[in-house]
Amino acid sequence: MQVFLKATHFDFIGRRKPAIYASLFLIGVSLVSLFTQGLNFGIDFAGGTLIQVRFEKPMDLAPVRQAIAPLDLGDTVVQSFGTPEEVLIRVEKQGADNAAQQAIVSGVLDALKPIAGEHGVEMRRVEYVGPQVGEELTEKGMLAMLYAMVAILIYISFRFELRFALGAVLALVHDVVLTMGFFSVLQKEFTLVVVAALLTVVGYSLNDTIVVYDRIREEMKRMKRQPLATIINEAVNRTLSRTLITSLTTVLVLIALFVLGGAVIHDFALTLLFGVGIGTYSSIFVASPLVLLMDPGSRRKVAAETAEETP
């Protein structure tokens, strides 16, 4: 791939309009879905019951899931916790009072006894996540992304220029909105794990964008007499092989995680798979054209070209 992409001369800026229209369409679909059917919040945000148990021997998670499935506890997450003997069970169902909560815990323990063997199962911890806690986690998750965006805006403003910073932040907003829209359209469960993956996507996409922006800045010094559109095209083409090879190797690892990682890491890997693809696209077709659009001279030229195309 390095050989084939070493000296590419694609006109990315000349083809920016179809990419912009595609992005606007996908953002529109995402926003409509987010505002109409919203996100399918998991136990972390919607509330539920958390039960930590210990078996005397290492326990496979599949029998645990099968044992508690008939209890009708809503969305259920089962994962190892620390050691193979420790299992963490999170269920959507909440008790209206203490008696109902105890009934849920007792039902889970009774369901696990047949698979625990003669040594039985020991309850180590029980926590109840109410709706108020879920709302607090939602607020903190959104604030974490907002603070990340502000910090990125400040950093790139100092590192490059304000137009680069605005382009990077808008590209990141593009990535986050499309990823959240993906979860909303498919009604995939949205948990704290997905929020962590979203922040990882932001970091990955930003890294791709900064590599392109750094090359644009270097080309601006080297090609002082050239139009900005030509400079951006040259910079994107020079970084194209690095961008695609990095994304490809990352995707291969994520596919392995998605296929082999099990149910616990499934949503994390899925979020990153989608986010890395969108982030690679945005660093080439969104972040770079935004630098052109935010340049005063280029804006006037773009406006003139648009006027000439209009009959």
Curated annotation (Swiss-Prot):
List UniProt keywords, sorted A-Z. Cell inner membrane, Cell membrane, Membrane, Protein transport, Translocation, Transmembrane, Transmembrane helix, Transport
Subcellular localization(s) per the UniProt record: Cell inner membrane
GO cellular component terms, semicolon-separated: plasma membrane
Q: Tell me the membrane topology, using the record's own terms.
A: Multi-pass membrane protein
Write out the GO MF terms: protein-transporting ATPase activity
> Which InterPro entries does the entry mention?
SecD/SecF_arch_bac, SecD/SecF_bac, SecD/SecF_CS, SecD_SecF_C, SecD_SecF_C_bact, SecF_bac
A Pfam family reported for this protein in Swiss-Prot or TrEMBL: Sec_GG
Residues spanning the membrane = 19-39, 142-162, 166-186, 192-212, 245-265, 272-292
Q: Name one GO biological process term.
A: protein transport by the Sec complex
Which family does the similarity line name?
Belongs to the SecD/SecF family. SecF subfamily.
Subunit notes for this chain? Forms a complex with SecD. Part of the essential Sec protein translocation apparatus which comprises SecA, SecYEG and auxiliary proteins SecDF-YajC and YidC.
Quote the protein name from its UniProt record: Protein translocase subunit SecF
Q: Which organism is it from?
A: Magnetococcus marinus (strain ATCC BAA-1437 / JCM 17883 / MC-1)
**Underlying gene:** secF
